[in-house]
Amino acid sequence: MSLLYYSRIRFILKLTPLLLCSQNPSGAHVTSIFAGTVEDAIDAKNLPIGPPPPEKYGVTSVRTHVSFMKTHFFEALAEQHAGNISFIHVFPGLVDGPTFYNDANPLWFRVLWRVAKVMMSWYMTSPQVCGEVMVLLGTGRYPAKGVAVGGDDVAFSSTRERGGGAYAVDQRGDEKKQVSYEKLRQSDTRDRVWKHTMGVLNGIQGMTG
């Protein structure tokens, strides 16, 4: 989880002074590739703020916690840096690449993948399309919050504000049709995510000097 969330937030915060120097009319663009728009079922009484408990730690639980916190933290950053920086969390989908055929994978997997690929081709994203989407994310379709925008091609943010500065998008660069985590949002959710994240990062910095 440290590589999927905490270290990425740390990079963003440390690079912010350079990002603020951007002359891009739509602002600088920060793109985090993981699970944008993937919203797992969540207990409203137990919001996934912080890492999952050890007994529940796994691929799905980590995704749940990372996606939830990243959405709210990006919204906070978009507010702080309105007019200057855009924050995008993208789900790239299943991208057909050389990793699946790497000799480091077991032979059975490489054989099985060649069969599975045929059945999953309708769902997969080609490397070319994936690359085109990543380039698109750096354009004015996803501007910093408050940047003067016009036209229906400007994306809606995770709060369903057109050009809102914090975006959760899928493998085609499309946003959700409703507010992210709409039924789970509380008045202090964003603040709780912020305090937790900064507490962890400040604690680590204190340990390392």
Predicted ranges, named:
Residues 19-43, 82-85:
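Active-site loop of short-chain dehydrogenase/reductase
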